[in-house]
Amino acid sequence: AGISFVVNPTRQNAITRGTLAEEEFTGDMDDAAWHLESIQEKGLPVNEINAYNHMAIYLRWCIEHDLMSAEFMERYWEQVQPFMADLSRADLRGFIRDQLKGQLFGALFNKEGAAFAGYYYGEADSPYFPSDIDNYALEYFGSEQYYSDKFQDEAYLFIPFDENYYQAMAKVMEKRFANWQGQSFDEATLEPSDLAEAMMEYLDCECTYFPSMTDDDPIMSAYNYAKRESVKEGFVPVLIKADDEILWECLIMNSNPDSDGEDDFAFDPDKVAEYRKKMLSAPVENSKAVLEEMIGQRKEEAEDDDMDWDEEILGEMEGGYDNRRFSSYWNSDNNMTYPLILAKIPVKNPWEIFAYLPFGGWNECPNTPELMAVAKYWFEQHGAVPAAMSHDELEFLLPAPVPEEKAMDAAVELYGFCPDVIDQGPEDATVGALADVLRQSTVWYFWWD
């Protein structure tokens, strides 16, 4: 199991809070020879000039944003000047091939450009320009084509080199650049705490630790890269609050109940492995029956409280908003993220992550078999995947919002599963208002009191 740390003191701008690092990045970023080798060895049916596509996009963006060194502009002015007249018509691929010997490297850029290159193109970290290119290829071609034998893991070489490609990537690069300039970290969290270390050991899979930061761009880019890789690699990525003692207690209580929750975060790995095996080998409960029982409980509670189910609980489908961002990892006290772990849980199906993260079974929070049953149903119905959690919060990510005609039924299920989303919400919260959120949202948020 590998553990990586997103903050690496030698990495450009990791700890310098958006200012330029002392050391200038002069290293190699990319070499067309690597991509040409793929084309030749795999016999890919593409023109060899395509090996330079993504490099030309990066170079053009940096020229447009005045990130090139004075030496570069002087030395190559004759060749670059015609491009400067109309960059939208510029094809820098031949220039990179013939003048730069097919390479991009830090010395081509001015101080700011080199520092940004070190951050975004120097190391296979997050965010990382080549990974953003791969993500765009997935978005452009769709899953089936992207993972097809035709592309042989090299879909990026097949993207048509046109203005649409450039503009799509320019938008991504602008976001990365703005994040890099404004980013700051809580220095006290740069190294994982003892609890975070224990949590990663408990998860026993590839984990990346993220310190507390003001902009979640590195976190979300890493999550999105992992999501793309997960299809081939066979894991499910989950973002987990790292310094959550109650979450730790819940995990141990469920998977290693004989442990008295030692102060040094000790646990019995054999017992934990046994628990996981047991949960994964048991047949998943009848999802519909589990949800119907939960909804039945809510109806009984409404009756006990003399509340009219249709009028007061369901209400009208109105007053919603769109929710497309995770909120469970934000600390509202300082507007920074909590320290987080991105875990690549080694399971085949999204609902099976709860065998590794059995955080429920207290108050109204469902137990592990119930979590698995409901998550399986929602994945099959809506493509919903559990994506982020703390001890009392759980967020699902969906490929698209629930269609309006199905939103009310889905909202009733969500209320059955987690009554606090409405009962602990604003006074006028209803299932209908929740349905109005669902029809606009790709993130479902749950919170148990």
Language model features by range: what are they?
Residues 1-9:
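Alpha-helical transmembrane anchor segments and their immediate juxtamembrane flanks
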Residues 17-68, 442-449:
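Short, extreme N-terminal segment that most often corresponds to the first beta-strand
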Residues 89-165, 297, 301, 386-421:
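Amphipathic protein-protein interaction modules
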Residues 185-350:
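Extended, low-hydrophobicity segments enriched in charged/polar residues
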Residues 218-222, 365-376, 407-412:
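Well-ordered, non-membrane alpha-helical segments in soluble/globular domains
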